[in-house]
């Protein structure tokens, strides 16, 4: 198909010489028909409102596309749900710890914290287990229960057991090769007093039941021939 011929634009007011047109300004006013436009709009030229400026985008579009397809991360709509407590664990239940530093120790369950962990204690005066948090996956609930109505556990939460983050200092060459043992971290006096208060309330309930103090002080273990799946705790 042949290309269409372009018609050259003709100037309505050709220049006689450079900068001087053939027709005057008033002649061009009538020649262009501006008088008719003015008469049509009540003797005033029509005005058009300025178009609103489009705001520049905050993020400029990418100039190049990635060579490989990039997976778009999905929105996580999962909401944290409170951890369901085992039916065998209720406030005052004696638990057996199965793992960790106090493996085999019997402890008293006080309450469940917001994180889902269990707040337990020995008491410390009987078997050396202080107030601590334990995951319910690592305990066995027994049928033995203790009255803990006299124990106040309102102040104990997850923040109570949190540790203060300390900035690590770079050791010099001399400090690195020193064989001196680091100083043991001392337990705050406030936590010691809290432990004594909880122990005092628990021991009153424990001493009211014969042989319960000896039971809590003894470590749980399996002897030869015992079948764990057949035991009744």
From Swiss-Prot:
UniProt KW keywords: Ribonucleoprotein, Ribosomal protein
Domain of life, source organism: Eukaryota
Region annotated Disordered, chain positions: 175-195
GO biological process entries: translation
GO molecular function: mRNA binding; structural constituent of ribosome
GO cellular component terms listed in the entry, alphabetical order: cytosolic large ribosomal subunit; cytosolic ribosome; endoplasmic reticulum; nucleus; plasma membrane; plasmodesma
InterPro entries: 60S_ribosomal_eL6 (IPR000915), Rib_uL2_dom2 (IPR014722), Ribosomal_eL6_KOW (IPR041997), Ribosomal_uL6_N (IPR005568), Translation_prot_SH3-like_sf (IPR008991)
Pfam family, one: Ribosomal_L6e_N
Keyword check for Chloroplast: no
Family from the record: Belongs to the eukaryotic ribosomal protein eL6 family.
Name of the protein in its database record: Large ribosomal subunit protein eL6z
């Amino acid at each position: 198909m042949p290309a269409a011929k372009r018609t050259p634009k003709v100037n309505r007011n050709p220049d006689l010489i450079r900068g001087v047109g053939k027709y005057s300004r008033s002649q061009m006013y009538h020649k262009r028909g501006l008088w008719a436009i003015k008469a049509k709009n009540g003797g005033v030229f029509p005005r058009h409102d300025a178009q609103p400026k489009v705001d520049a985008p905050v993020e400029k579009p990418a100039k190049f596309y990635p060579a490989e397809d990039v997976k778009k991360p999905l929105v996580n709509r999962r909401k944290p749900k409170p951890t369901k407590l085992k039916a065998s664990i209720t406030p005052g239940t004696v638990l057996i710890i199965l793992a960790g530093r106090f493996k085999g120790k019997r402890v008293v369950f006080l309450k469940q914290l917001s994180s889902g962990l269990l707040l337990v204690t020995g008491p410390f005066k009987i078997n050396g287990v202080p107030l601590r948090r334990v995951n319910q996956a690592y305990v066995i609930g027994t049928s033995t229960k203790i009255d803990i109505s006299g124990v106040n556990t309102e102040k104990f939460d997850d923040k109570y057991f949190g540790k203060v983050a300390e900035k690590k200092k770079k050791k010099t060459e001399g400090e690195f090769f020193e064989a001196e043992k680091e100083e043991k971290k001392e337990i705050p006096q406030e936590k010691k007093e809290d432990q004594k208060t909880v122990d005092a309330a628990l021991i009153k309930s424990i001493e009211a039941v014969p042989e319960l103090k000896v039971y809590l002080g003894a470590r749980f273990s399996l002897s030869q021939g015992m079948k764990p799946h057949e035991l009744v705790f």
